[in-house]
């Protein structure tokens, strides 16, 4: 049985990858994520979310492995970064496979480079949602009961009115209409935060959202949130 460390951001794609891996029979051993500190936005084009990743891990009943980037960190140093994640995941939770939430790989053979880098570190690498386009991913969230907040939009591609709203049937209809009009919205044009999931033993409630902008993205930073526990036992979903 595979013991998986999910490369996790708290968004819909990494969460769907986790659910897909678990449904295939894998054991989800931990979540792994980089924390870029003061340079996080420069590195990852997003706000840092270590507390949210840790909150998700608690609701899932698995450990969170948060790797702080050092002064020599480089986003494009793929082999080194994959090796860092693999080593940390192996030590923290005994994982042997990384799970990536990359969807509709837009970088040619980049996923093959990820797999080769993982193999050099003695790991497998699975990308269970790589064939998902944005419309399918949103539809799957709705079908599974995954609630996700839209926390970022590419200003030139996605109408700003969706910022701060949850993925829903109306947003799905908007994506379909854009596609029919020849203005396809890609997964990279959207950032989300999962609030509730069938795998969570509760939910995340944002309390303070602060608007901002990074490059061409309009973003909402979750400055305050709380976790509400439900009746489900954390980890009950993880039967691999």
Predicted regions and their residues:
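Nucleotide-activated chemistry modules centered on ATP-dependent adenylation/adenylyltransferase
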Residues: 1-240
């Amino acid at each position: 049985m595979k013991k998986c460390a999910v490369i996790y951001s708290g968004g819909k794609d990494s969460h769907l990858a986790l659910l897909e891996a678990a449904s295939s029979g894998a054991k989800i051993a931990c979540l792994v994520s980089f924390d870029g500190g003061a340079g996080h936005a420069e590195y990852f084009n997003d706000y840092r979310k270590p507390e949210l990743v840790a909150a998700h891990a608690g609701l899932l009943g698995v450990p969170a492995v948060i790797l702080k980037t050092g002064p020599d960190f480089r986003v494009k140093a793929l082999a080194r970064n994959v090796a860092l994640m693999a080593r940390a995941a192996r030590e923290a939770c005994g994982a042997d496979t990384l799970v990536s939430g990359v969807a509709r790989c837009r970088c040619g053979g980049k996923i093959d480079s990820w797999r080769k880098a993982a193999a050099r570190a003695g790991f497998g690498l699975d990308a269970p949602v790589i064939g998902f386009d944005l419309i399918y991913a949103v539809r799957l969230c709705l079908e599974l009961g995954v609630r996700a907040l839209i926390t970022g939009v590419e200003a030139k591609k996605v109408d700003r009115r969706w910022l701060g709203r949850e993925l829903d049937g109306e947003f799905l209809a908007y994506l379909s209409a854009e596609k029919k009009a020849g203005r396809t919205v890609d997964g990279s044009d959207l950032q989300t935060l999962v609030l509730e999931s069938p795998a969570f033993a509760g939910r995340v409630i944002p309390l303070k959202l602060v608007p901002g902008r990074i490059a061409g993205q309009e973003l909402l930073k979750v400055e305050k949130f709380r976790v509400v526990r439900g009746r489900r036992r954390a980890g009950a979903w993880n039967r691999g």
